[in-house]
Amino acid sequence: MFAKSATIAIVLAALAGFSAAVPTADCRTSKTCSSGKVALVAPAAPVGSCSTGKVQCCNSVEHSTQPHVNNLLLGLEHFGLVKGLIGGLTGNVGIQCSPLLLSGNSCTAQTACCENVHFNGLIAVGCSPVNLSLL
């Protein structure tokens, strides 16, 4: 039990450092904005479609080769929290993603359709950006 608690503490400490390293920008005009959780974002799906899963609201979208993104993914894989995310991973990674309910929530950041969400949005793999105004 102690080992699991220590692992979680290390990952949370890494996330805190990761959050401080992410640049801030206007999420409506840029794919890079504030910090947080991670989701893989693939090339854009047809506008308005979300057949892959729930729509996510991500505060930032960064390329998987960015050192801080890659280090976070490697750390999660190293501690056995995720498996197989790094090998062959290409594309963008969304930062701080949470489910978006079309009925009432609004997203002032980057919206994306995601099919595999891990750790309550910490990592969501298989995402595509989506324009909700056209849904």
Swiss-Prot record:
Its main location: secreted. The keyword Glycoprotein applies. PROSITE patterns: HYDROPHOBIN. GO terms for cellular component: extracellular region; fungal-type cell wall. Disulfide bonds join 50-113, 57-107, 58-97, 114-127. Glycans are attached at residue 131. Keywords: Cell wall, Disulfide bond, Glycoprotein, Secreted, Signal. Self-assembles to form functional amyloid fibrils called rodlets. Self-assembly into fibrillar rodlets occurs spontaneously at hydrophobic:hydrophilic interfaces and the rodlets further associate laterally to form amphipathic monolayers. This is Class I hydrophobin 15.
